[in-house]
């Protein structure tokens, strides 16, 4: 309906957007290429392209979004960071919980990238993970890393209160003040909404 929009990338855009840009740079129409996840209006006015949203199967294929050249402008700033995608819940009103699956970036890579932020004196690393504490095998080693790091960097985590245990309480007590900031994801207090 909006004639100012040529293309829409549905779902996770890393692969589809790259393919679309490559097609356009090579003088091709991104709609004729039938790129999964790309839809738009052809010059004729007809809607064309893929109708399915794309999901990146292997998160390790997604490159680290920050480069050395950016850091001069980003030092002492807030950086958004993702260590997982998806949500284990299926709240009716939420876009993130539509599949009840969570995928994780490789943990070794995550530690390396967090250390990179620390080395570059980032003020805050704001995790955009929907539910940071949804999987103990994933979040506990990272919280230990945050606790033990020699840094002034603050880590902002969105956590589900019902999934917090004595372990999380203990590690927060052992962590230097101001190191970890928790945002509790209270979705609703209305039982009917939650059902």
What are the language-model segments listed below?
Residues 52-59:
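A short, sequence-level motif marking secondary-structure junctions
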Residues 1-52:
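Glycine-rich beta-alpha loop elements in corrinoid/cobalamin-binding modules
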Residues 60-195:
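Radical SAM [4Fe-4S] cluster-binding motif and immediate context
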Residues 31-33, 55, 74, 150:
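A generic structural signal for short, non-catalytic loop/turn and secondary-structure boundary residues
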Residues 13, 43, 55, 67, ...:
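Residues that form or immediately flank small-molecule/cofactor binding pockets and catalytic motifs
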Residues 24-25, 56, 97:
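Amphipathic, positively biased hydrophobic alpha-helical segments used for protein targeting
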């Amino acid at each position: 309906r909006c004639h100012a929009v040529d293309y829409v990338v549905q779902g996770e855009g890393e692969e589809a957007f790259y393919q679309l840009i490559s097609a356009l740079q090579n003088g091709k129409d991104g709609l004729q290429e039938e790129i999964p996840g790309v839809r738009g209006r052809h010059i004729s006015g007809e809607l064309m392209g893929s109708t399915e949203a794309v999901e990146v199967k292997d998160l390790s294929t997604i490159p680290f979004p920050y480069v050395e050249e950016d850091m001069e402008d980003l030092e002492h700033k807030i950086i958004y960071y993702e260590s997982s995608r998806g949500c284990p819940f299926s709240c009716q009103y939420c876009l993130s919980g539509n599949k009840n699956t969570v995928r994780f970036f490789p943990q070794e890579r995550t530690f390396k990238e967090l250390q990179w932020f620390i080395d570059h004196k980032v003020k805050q690393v704001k995790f955009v993970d929907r539910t940071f504490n949804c999987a103990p095998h994933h979040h506990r080693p990272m919280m230990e890393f945050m606790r033990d790091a020699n840094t002034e960097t603050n880590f902002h985590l969105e956590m589900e209160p019902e999934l917090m245990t004595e372990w999380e309480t203990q590690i927060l007590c052992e962590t230097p003040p101001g190191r970890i900031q928790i945002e509790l994801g209270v979705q609703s207090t209305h039982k009917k909404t939650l059902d």
